[in-house]
């Protein structure tokens, strides 16, 4: 399919099924595969292929390449929906979408090569200690080792951090030029394929490198030729998609717990629905889920409005938005834990979906970028109190 064909198809006046609805059609299949994927420590091959073909990895890819060209709210809906099926699958789905958005900020000739014949590029990306580079004419020799390359086992490329002239850059490296070390052996988020990758004297074009700050920027990048507003937003306007994963997991937990209210938890126990405490536990989770939706939607719209203003967000605004995400994560984690405890010993079976979701969300609360609750809350408190940046605050923030 040519670029013209893809643009024509994307601009068709025929009614399009909302991508959140498309995602919902995958839910039974995702749930059926969740335990197997957890044990295999990777997503199902056919599932990944079919989700990509359905457009679930190209939600925010511009229409020029055959993507949907949608925005933060629509990405939230897709993430929330997929998370109702499995948190690991949603995590990879979100990252594939984010990383496509990053790739669409590179120069046109780079994008033409990457998106030739496809509407999405399955790409891992890492934000950790940078590797090294050496210039060889108009090319770069890259060396480095990076862990947590989410989605790498199904990816064709990776974005890895390196230093170039003392600046932090992300460079695109094709999968065939990387060594993959399958060391992702964890008790939660097992299917995310967050393996370690290594580049040894890997040579890439210098045009495949971009400063990290430009990647996060609203308009200081080479992808401004795209017409969609999402390409004129900073990355901070997209990060509520991660919160949407938490919200979707809680929605699923409320649904599962509602179904289990009519079951007993012991030989001499009445059905849970006849016990006041069980009913209160469930309705608290139900209301918490409704509130988390409102917080997420408010945070998303607030970020979009700040971006449309055309000036960088202040530290106070960054802290305010961070508090939304931190509160959603911690609240969902605690609510899931409470629901698992209220489901009796069967809630701890290895194949229990509620148990898996609770463990996955608990693990995400330790994530170096999206978690570490105590560190982030102290940081946001300082910023809101006007104390400014501290020496150990990250110099490269996803804002």
Provide a role label for each language-model segment.
Residues 1-21, 25, 395-399:
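Basic/polar N-terminal segments that are highly enriched at the extreme N-terminus
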Residues 24, 248, 283-290, 322, ...:
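Generic structural signal for well-ordered, non-transmembrane alpha-helical segments
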Residues 31, 35-38, 291-327, 337-348:
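C-terminal helix-coil-helix/basic helical segment that borders enzyme active sites and/or dimer interfaces
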Residues 45-53, 57-155:
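Glycine-rich flavin
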Residues 48-49, 270-277, 305-322, 345-363:
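Charge-rich, acidic-biased intrinsically disordered regions
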Residues 148-185, 193:
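A short core secondary-structure module
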Residues 188, 194-290:
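Glycine-rich beta->alpha junctions and the first turn(s) of the following alpha-helix
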Residues 343-399:
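Glycine-rich phosphate/cofactor-binding loops in nucleotide/flavin-utilizing enzymes
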């Amino acid at each position: 399919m040519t670029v013209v064909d893809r643009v024509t198809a994307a601009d068709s006046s025929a009614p399009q099924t909302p991508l959140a609805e498309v995602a919902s059609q995958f839910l039974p299949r995702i749930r059926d595969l969740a335990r197997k994927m957890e044990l295999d420590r990777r997503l199902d091959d056919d599932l990944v292929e079919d989700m990509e073909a359905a457009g679930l990895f190209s939600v925010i890819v511009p229409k020029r390449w055959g993507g949907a060209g949608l925005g933060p709210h629509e990405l939230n809906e897709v993430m929330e929906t997929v998370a109702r099926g499995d948190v690991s699958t949603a995590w990879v789905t979100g990252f594939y979408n984010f990383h496509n958005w990053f790739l669409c900020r590179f120069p046109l000739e780079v994008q033409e090569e990457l998106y030739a014949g496809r509407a999405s590029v399955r790409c891992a990306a890492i934000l950790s200690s940078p590797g090294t580079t050496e210039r060889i004419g108009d090319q770069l020799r890259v060396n480095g080792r990076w862990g947590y390359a989410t989605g790498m086992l199904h990816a064709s490329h990776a974005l890895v951090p390196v230093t170039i002239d003392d600046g932090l850059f992300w460079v695109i490296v094709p999968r065939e030029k990387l060594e993959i070390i399958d060391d992702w052996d964890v008790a939660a988020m097992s299917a995310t394929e967050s393996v370690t990758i290594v580049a040894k004297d890997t040579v890439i074009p210098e045009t495949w490198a971009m400063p990290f700050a430009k990647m996060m920027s609203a308009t200081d990048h080479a992808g401004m030729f795209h017409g969609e507003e999402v390409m004129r937003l900073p990355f901070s306007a997209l990060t509520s998609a991660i919160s949407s994963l938490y919200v979707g997991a809680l929605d699923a937990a409320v649904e599962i717990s509602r179904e289990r209210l009519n079951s007993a938890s012991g030989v001499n126990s009445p059905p849970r629905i006849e016990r006041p405490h069980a009913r209160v536990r469930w309705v608290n989770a139900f209301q918490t889920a409704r509130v988390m939706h409102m917080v997420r939607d408010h945070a998303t719209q607030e970020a979009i409005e700040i971006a449309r203003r055309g000036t960088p967000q202040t530290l106070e605004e960054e802290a305010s938005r961070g508090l939304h995400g931190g509160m959603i994560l911690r609240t969902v984690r605690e609510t899931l834990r409470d629901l698992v405890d209220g489901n009796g010993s069967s809630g701890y079976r290895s194949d229990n979906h509620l148990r898996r979701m609770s463990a996955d969300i608990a693990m995400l609360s330790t994530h170096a970028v999206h978690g570490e609750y105590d560190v982030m809350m102290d940081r946001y408190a300082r910023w809101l109190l006007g104390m400014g940046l501290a020496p150990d605050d990250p110099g490269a923030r996803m804002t």
